[in-house]
Amino acid sequence: MADIKLIALDLDGTLLTTDKKLTDRTKATLKAAREQGVKVVLTTGRPLKAMDFFLKELGTDGHDDEYTITFNGGLVQKNTGEILDKTVFSIDDVTRIYEETEKLEIPLDAISEGTVYQIQSDQESLYAQFNPALTFVPTAFEDLSSQVTYNKCVTAFPQEPLDEAIQKISPELYDQYEIFKSRELLLEWSPKNVHKATGLSKLIEYLGIDRSKVMACGDEANDLSMIEWAGLGVAMQNAVPAVKAVANVVTPMTNDEEAVAWAIEKYVLKEN
């Protein structure tokens, strides 16, 4: 197996415990990997603004030679905020998605950088519960600006009615956009061909790292692309079946039992 040069980590359900904590053991293994010259790249659906706390915890915030992939691969950037690659929605894309969610009677939020435009609806969005650090702006659909670029859209709604609605999404939308669940209550809408693997592919090209030397860890449907793409794809024990099916390794423990620390100790850290 090739020496691992980059570790791509999903946050929720993977790196973090259920109560959104980084354990001391996990932080220690990440620090040890970085001291060996391995890049540790948080790879998430969140915007960078919602990552500040975790980057500080890792000691990589504001660093010119540290990187984060946000919006499920739609934004590749240095931890200084400098953008290396960006793919976004136009207002026409948001309009098409909004028409579908209105028909399905589910809410829609449109996200631009650290601002969440909560499109007014009869159905209440639950997204503020997931990312309270973001700025939430209640907005009538007709007031959405065509001058703003939108990184992604989200539908945060109770699981049972959300899953029922997903079954009714028009097939043509799957041809036009990336549509996937990232949590039980969260459906994400991204530009076509934007997923974590494409973001990582662009980053390793910039860094000159071969994908055979990438280890990717995840648990949900939005992690599947990078788990399948990476030289070493690691699924958490708590991962959805589709992710486990494409992984090279399934950890014997869950995210609450420090599965990422186990994987780094086993596959990355070398004896001095």
Give names to the regions the model predicted.
Residues E100, L104-C217:
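Conserved acidic, metal-coordinating active-site core of Asp-based
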Residues D3-D19:
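Asp-based phosphoryl-transfer active-site loop
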Residues A33, N72, C153, I227, ...:
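Residue-level signal for inorganic ion chemistry
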Residues D24-E124:
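Active-site phosphate-binding/coordination module
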Residues G37-V41, D65-E66, K152, S212-K213, ...:
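Short active-site oxyanion
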Residues A2-L6, T23, E188-N272:
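Mg2+-dependent phosphoryl-transfer enzymes with acidic/Ser/Thr/Gly-rich catalytic loops
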Residues V41, I69, D109, F180, ...:
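Structural detector of well-ordered beta-strand residues that form the stable sheet scaffold
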Residues L58, D64, N72, L173-D175, ...:
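Short, structured coil segments at secondary-structure junctions
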